[in-house]
A protein has these predicted regions:
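Conserved alpha/beta-hydrolase "acid-adjacent" motif
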Residues: 157-163
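Short beta-strand/loop motif that positions the catalytic acidic residue
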Residues: 143-144, 150-152
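Hydrophobic, aromatic-rich cap/lid helix
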Residues: 113-139, 155
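Conserved acidic catalytic loop of the alpha/beta-hydrolase fold
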Residues: 42-59
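Catalytic histidine-centered segment of alpha/beta-hydrolase-like enzymes
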Residues: 181-194
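Conserved HGGG/HGGXW glycine-rich cap/lid loop of the alpha/beta-hydrolase fold
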Residues: 1-37
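Flexible "cap/lid" loop of the alpha/beta hydrolase fold
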Residues: 41, 76, 82-111
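Gly/Ala-rich beta-loop-alpha elbow adjacent to hydrolase catalytic centers
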Residues: 63-71
Length: 205
């Protein structure tokens, strides 16, 4: 079974390297979501779907943050070889989410150099966040048939409640909290992330 990794906003495919190195007994691929041509959530969704539709072997989608939302949304598409989902720090509903709106406002106010220091692009971060402010995955989660592993860091307070809500909606799901884990678990807690994911993959066999 192949693992296909989807990174978060402000990250790159490289963000999954440590996790991939800890799961080398599974073939894997980390998709670079954004480029100069692919610079919106809708374009990313279309391109990743086209890529996944061409997969010829069974695969599991592993996503963090934006990548998790993308994985969950794509689970409602026609993907015959999709077997399961691993979602980390996944937002469920950003429409009407005051904290997300405040974050978007801060993004708009921060100077470009702050983003550049983090290796991020301000216009991309703001543009994609604008698209996501109407996101509501409640209906998709409620009808998702795939076995799903939900992972959240104990320090990721903004996403803990949405992950608990996802766990209630996803009838075939497991929920694991990583102690002292922040939002960016693929970077901060790769060993723990890989161990939990490995246990889930063994459970699927």
């Amino acid at each position: 079974m192949k693992l296909i990794f989807l990174h978060g906003l402000g990250q790159s495919a490289e963000s999954w390297k440590e996790v991939q190195n800890l799961l080398t007994d599974y073939p894997s691929e980390a998709i670079e979501l954004f480029s100069s041509e692919v610079n919106s959530y809708q374009k990313v969704k279309d391109r990743v779907y086209q890529h996944l539709a061409q997969e010829t072997e069974p695969f599991v989608l592993v996503g963090l943050s934006l990548g998790a939302a993308l994985a969950l949304e794509l689970s409602s598409y026609d993907l015959p070889n999709l077997q399961a989902l691993v979602l980390s720090g996944c937002p469920l509903k950003l429409a009407g989410n005051i904290l997300f709106y405040i974050q978007l406002l801060i993004f708009k106010l921060l100077p470009k150099r702050v983003f550049e220091k983090q290796g991020a692009d301000k216009s991309l971060m703001v543009g994609v966040s604008e698209e996501l402010k109407t996101l509501d995955l409640t209906a998709i989660a409620g009808s998702c048939p795939y076995p799903t592993l939900l992972i959240c860091g104990s320090k990721d307070k903004p996403n803990l409640s949405s992950m608990k809500a996802l766990h209630r909606l996803l009838t075939n799901s497991q929920f694991q909290i990583i102690p002292d884990g922040p939002h960016i678990l693929n970077r901060a807690k790769p060993k723990e992330f890989a161990e939990i994911t490995r246990s889930f993959l063994e459970f699927l066999k």
